[in-house]
Structures are given as C-alpha cells and as structure tokens.
Amino acid sequence: TMDETKTDRSSMMAWNFSVPDFFSYANASKDNKQFTHAATKKRLVGAFGEFRASWKNMLYLTVSGRNDWTSTLPLENRSYFYPSVSGSFVFTEALQRLGWLDDSVLNFGKLRASWAKVGKDTGVYELETALWPTGTYLDGTVGVGNTWTRGNDKLKPEMTKSTEIGVELSFFKNRLHIDYAYYTNDSYNQILAPRGPQSTGYIFWSINAGNVYNKGMELSISGTPIQTKAVSYTHLRAHETSA
C-alpha cells in the first residue's frame, strides 16, 4: 500500500487600509500586507502479510506482520516492522468429541490470547529546524526566523505493545453469555514536544520521551431470562477497570 498526503496553504493579511471599511488585500500598501504560502508532502509505503490456520473447529491461529517506510523519519529509522499473533481454543468442541460435555448447561466455551505490536511515525518536517517569514520590517525588509519547535534528526517511530487473554462462555442453549478479558498496553518512544528554555531560541523540542503503560479488565454478562415465541427479553451488563 502507499499513502501520499499533500497540503498546499496560502494566506494573505492586510492592515491599515487606505480606504476605511473597505476590506480588500488591494486596499493596503506593500508595507501593510503579508502573503504566506506553505506546502507539505508525506509518503507512507507499507507491506502486509497474514497467515491463518485452523484445526477441526477447535484451534485457530493468526499471524500477521506489517512493515512501513515513512518519509517523516530519518533514514536509519524510517523502516519499522510490527507483528501480531493471536490464537483461540474452543474447548467445548474438544469436550464434545470426547463425550464429556453436557451441552444443556455449557454449550460453548473458548479461550483466546493475542499479542500485537503497532508502530507509528510522526508529522512532516519534524527532523530539521525550519525557517519561516516573520513579517515585513525596517522599510520593507522581510524578516525570517526559526520556527517555535527545534527539529530532531534522531527521532524513532512510536511503538505500542498490547497483550490480551480472555474467555467466552455460553450456557443454557445460549441464554447466558459471559465474556471476560484482561489486557495490557505499553506505549514507548512516544514523540512529544515539551517546552524548553527560550534562551535556546526555541519554545518546543521534538523528542522521543513518552512511555505509558496501562492494564485493565473487561467483563460483560448478557442473558435472556424470558424467551418465548411471542416475547423475548435480553439484559446486558458490562464492567471495565483500568490502571
């Protein structure tokens, strides 16, 4: 896949109009107007592969991988790979084959687990410190200065590692469903722009600094206590905790 994003932005400002209340760019002298133009271009190329396998409606496995090449990171870091793997085991299918399942009580049960890594690049032109026009001063002289953010040519891609394990259960001919999951998310090398000392000539600095870890549990219970040909009532209750 290839994703290319382009922006092209122009703006005009004018003040101290020659004719009052006539708001036109042409109604100002060259010393009282400013024109700016900005263009950006970003390209992201990705390659993706996936493998799926199953065995006797009991075991399922999915393995995938993606590699991205981005134009917004330095040459040594612009290629990054992130894989994922997930699997599940329908244990009620195994119990049924062995003759150990009473499906009038438990008619479906599945264990699942997954691990994934996801990469992310950054915005355009964050590697180098650019110049931009600051206005017209001193008898028409055009002013040029640094942008507010100092570039960083050592930036790395952001990464997030996620894991999840869970179980799904259905009872009494699918009248009662329980779904439980425990998950973790670990994000590191986050690209931030914290404030720095203005004595350096910049206000913000682009760096890899953020690291966020959280974990949590999700539980949902749904049931159909009343089910007839004429009436059906289903109730769902969900709960989530995270830290």
Show which residues each predicted segment covers:
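Extracellular/periplasmic, surface-exposed regions of secreted and cell-surface proteins
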Residues: 1-236, 242
